[in-house]
């Protein structure tokens, strides 16, 4: 009753005529860890494919029905939404689908109606943290998560998705999420997802090194039109953002992808690789790789020399290249001080600090501020 009343109160704060886009409400909490393990909840869980979410769905339906009944009252006509949607977070312990696979007919089945949406418009908001976002959604290593989705999608339509694709503890490292998004956005479209939230660098936007500004652009384009070719989007981005420097910048991007693929293979990385801190830790890079990147950056800077006669254009192009330059610079600062001269190291540190400050870069990781690093340079 309390939850229903809070939703009803919110609807009165935002009348339909003034806020027509207010069409859904989220019932849930951020991270669903350590769910209840009492005897009664365990009994319900065991009945429904070992899914603890089976204890939550009936509660959600009760809340939704109360709100729907409230909206039908004549005095609440101004606040009524047609087909109002109630979402719940399917993440961690609550991601397991409460449906078993019936080998005899090749279909997912529910033990009873308590875990079905029935007449209520409730949908899961999936947070697929155990999908490997460096691989295609159709890759064999993503089979378990894909089957979990398929089980849910048998009974729930118009769902939402919270997706990932970076090193959350290292905002300066390159992460190859392009194999995933190339196929995933089409998959989500074909399965009637209505909202996708990509949690890339959630604490930093617009000045992301490691081509994460491009990653955000590509995701936005594919989520709007999943039939687009990712190679075309990459080329379009490079040509517009870097003009004559597109070729060396694209080579830098390819080198990043090759490093990521090699590191995954040699380190046997899985979906949990997002926890790694490559640029801030030893053993992930060879100095030859960094040196090669710096050489390509020198080519990129040389390509835009022609724009020095147009100071504003040159400044913008150089800054875009500078932001990507932060990636190898961070590797040197953290790992290879002894491999460069004292003067070169000081030059790298000074430029790194200036580019970060000029672009208001605030974080080294999702929860780590950059202040301490900049003060140490």
What name fits each language-model region?
Residues 48-58, 140-144, 172-180, 285, ...:
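Alpha-helix N-cap and loop-to-helix initiation/capping positions
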Residues 5, 9, 58-69, 144-151, ...:
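Alpha-helical scaffolding segments of alpha/beta enzyme cores, especially the outer helices
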């Amino acid at each position: 009753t309390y939850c229903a009343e809070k939703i009803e109160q919110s609807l009165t704060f935002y009348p339909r005529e003034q806020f027509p886009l207010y069409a859904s409400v989220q019932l849930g909490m951020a991270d669903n860890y350590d769910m209840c393990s009492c005897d009664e909840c365990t009994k319900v869980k065991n009945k429904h494919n070992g899914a603890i979410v089976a204890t939550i769905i009936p509660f959600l339906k009760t809340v939704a029905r109360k709100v729907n009944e409230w909206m039908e009252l004549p005095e609440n006509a101004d606040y009524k939404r047609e087909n109002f949607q109630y979402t719940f977070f399917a993440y961690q312990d609550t991601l397991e689908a409460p449906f078993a696979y019936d080998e005899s007919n090749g279909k997912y089945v529910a033990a009873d109606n308590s875990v079905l949406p029935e007449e209520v418009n409730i949908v899961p908001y999936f947070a697929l943290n155990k999908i490997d976002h460096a691989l295609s959604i159709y890759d064999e290593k993503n089979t378990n998560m894909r089957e979990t989705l398929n089980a849910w999608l048998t009974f729930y339509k118009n769902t939402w998705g919270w997706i990932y694709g970076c090193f959350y503890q290292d905002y300066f490292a390159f992460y190859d999420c392009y194999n995933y998004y190339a196929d995933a956005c089409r998959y989500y479209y074909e399965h009637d997802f209505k909202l996708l939230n990509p949690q890339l660098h959630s604490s930093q936007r617009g000045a992301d090194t490691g081509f994460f500004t491009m990653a955000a652009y590509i995701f936005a384009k594919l989520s709007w039109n999943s039939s687009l070719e990712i190679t075309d989007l990459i080329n379009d981005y490079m040509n517009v953002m870097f003009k004559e420097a597109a070729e060396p910048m694209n080579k830098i991007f390819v080198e990043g992808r090759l490093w990521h693929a090699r590191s995954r293979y040699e380190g046997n990385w899985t979906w949990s690789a997002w926890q790694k801190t490559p640029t801030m830790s030893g053993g992930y890079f060879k100095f030859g790789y960094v040196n090669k990147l710096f050489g390509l950056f020198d080519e990129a800077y040389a390509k835009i020399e022609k724009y020095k006669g147009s100071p504003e254009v040159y400044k913008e192009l150089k800054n875009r290249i500078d932001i990507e330059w932060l990636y190898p610079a961070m590797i040197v600062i953290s790992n290879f001080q002894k491999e460069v001269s004292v003067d070169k190291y000081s030059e790298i540190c000074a430029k790194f600090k200036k580019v970060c400050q000029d672009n208001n870069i605030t974080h080294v990781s999702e929860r780590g501020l950059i202040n301490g690093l900049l003060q140490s340079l």
